[in-house]
Amino acid sequence: MEIVAVYHSMLTSLKTFDELEVDPVCRGQIALSPIEECRMVTYLRVQRNVDSMIELKHVAHFQALSMIARSIFELSVDLRLMQSVPEASERMRCFQSLESLRAVKAAVKRSNEPNGSPVSKTVSDFDAHRKVSIEARATQLWGAKFNSVTHWSGFKLGERVSQIADDQISHVYIYAYRTMSWQTHPGLQGSYGLPASAFPAIANSALNLAVFSYLAVLRLMISTLGLQQHDRLIYARLNLAHTLPYTDGQAEELELRHSLGL
């Protein structure tokens, strides 16, 4: 069964808009600041996730669609948090190093256990030469609790959503994100006992969450890059890309364009 839902068309339409309007400007930037670089990497991760969702055209992929939609939502929250969390870029970079250190320490610990495999020189050197500096910086950023930090902001996802203080995002987190998590985590929840007719709805819910999150990302990137200052109709074209799949025929499309001032 092919997904013919309007949300799949929306996602494709928004990606086309992105490729024409936002992506070229992003890729044309030079000498990025640390926060700009973090924003760019996060934005590119969103793009690749969207590309994957667009390729998954069958309802049988409802679990993968849900997992990817969940990731896009989390990345969209990250982009918003970068605007408000102090030392965001430093925290993101340090957390990346901290995660690497955690993996290295686990490998070294395992290598010292019975039947453990020896670690490479790269791993042992990382543990020997970078551990002190990484943990010292982590202590500065998160205090003594740094070992329990699971996200660069220091907040769990629910807390991150609360930090943003956006009613729409809070609503989506409570009513949509959780159901996507059911398709991600082990257990019976999410699909057990459901009729076959439920799975297209699950796939469409995932696409809907992805559309909401991707639209938020594009709006943020337009604002951050200041594109609206040079092109007063860019938000109108974004709204067109979002709503065009709702139209039925050329007459409705022309009416929509007219209502948006295009």
Where are the model-predicted features located?
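Short capping loops/turns at secondary-structure boundaries
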Residues: 58, 65, 93-97, 169, ...
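Short, Φ-rich (hydrophobic/aromatic) sequence segments
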Residues: 42, 92-93, 205-210
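Short alpha-helical segments used as structural interaction elements across diverse proteins
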Residues: 42, 67, 88-90, 99, ...
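Short, glycine/acidic-rich hinge or "gate" loops at secondary-structure transitions
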Residues: 65-67, 84-93, 227-236
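Internal, hydrophobic cores of structured domains that mediate oligomerization or house catalytic pockets
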Residues: 69-110
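Alpha-helical solenoid scaffolds that mediate protein-protein interactions
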Residues: 46, 53, 65, 72, ...
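Long, hydrophobic/aromatic-enriched structural stretches that serve as scaffold segments
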Residues: 17-82
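Secondary-shell segments that build the walls of catalytic and ion/ligand-binding clefts
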Residues: 1-34, 99-262
